Amino acid sequence: MQELIEKIRQETANFEITDKDSAEAFRLKFLVRKGSIPQLFEQMKTVSKEDKPAVGKLLNELKLFADGKFKEAMEHIAANELAADDLADLTLPGRTHFLGAEHPVQKVLGDMKRIFQKMGFSTATGPEIERDAYNFTLLNFAPDHPARDMQDTFFIKKEADAEDVVLRTHTSPVQIRVMLEQAPPIRVICPGKVFRNEAVSARSYCVFHQLEGLYVDKGVTFADLKSTIYSFARQMFGSDVKMKFRPSYFPFTEPSAEVDITCYLCGGKGCRVCKHTGWLEILGCGMVHPNVLRNCGIDPEIYSGYAFGMGIERTALLRYNIDDIRLFFENDLRMLSQFE
């Protein structure tokens, strides 16, 4: 019996396991129920009582040896397979990584910010949920001004005995916050998201983006405002752009104006985009109203300033000849992929 055990031990030791097939052959020959080693355990009943301890010890050692060899071989095979999977064929082309593209609205906003930053403007932001005081009162809006009506503004809270809370309708409240916190000179742009209770159409949306600018210092004049707007328009729309200022009205500026540029599509000759006028409106502006300066603790007898504001989506519509503002909010890759 001991000679048979030694013979099978030699067979297990000499058996080469190089892959899964040879490992399975080893298992079937030595380890399964009808394999060589289990069959030796079946023959233990024929061993004399005196020899059983020694034979049993040899059998247990044989089984441990065979099990260990099989386990070690399987681990080695698995490690080799894993290493083979990790091998890279350096002759193959690399995998293409599809990166997202900057949204056209953000492209335009980024260009605007860079232009004004070169002029010395810093950037300020503020909350999108705003108090009535910052959104209307301190900006010289009369109590019965149409903009305060629920038909034009989204109210978060509207109570008779408490201050209204609204979704800001412009980024002008940021200018108020800056003037309340900072002494002149002030030169700042205020980009951000604004909200209007308007019907959604190809030309209007209930959410859009604005960029407003403010400059307050001693001796600021309308000529300074015109110079700033001219410089911006030439850098944004081209050096050959023509401009005109039209008188307008805003509660927070006096005098006020709206600025038109020659239609960049038709060169001022008239087309569908400019409604055959040859001109496109790009922004509103004016000299900061003395009441607004007083509301912010700035003496209008000493300081003056100008402010301007424009819609980012509107500028993007003009720049990219897009005819529907809703496309900016639909995340349609067929449209957005054109700006990669």
From Swiss-Prot:
Gene Ontology cellular component annotations, sorted alphabetically: cytoplasm
GO annotation, biological process: phenylalanyl-tRNA aminoacylation
Protein name per the record: Phenylalanine--tRNA ligase alpha subunit
The UniProt record lists the keyword Protein biosynthesis: yes
Organism this protein belongs to: Chloroherpeton thalassium (strain ATCC 35110 / GB-78)
Cofactor note: Binds 2 magnesium ions per tetramer.
Broadest EC class assigned to this enzyme: ligase
Sequence positions that bind Mg(2+): E254
SUPFAM superfamilies, A to Z: Class II aaRS and biotin synthetases, tRNA-binding arm
Pfam family, one: tRNA-synt_2d
EC number(s) given by UniProt: 6.1.1.20
Subcellular location: Cytoplasm
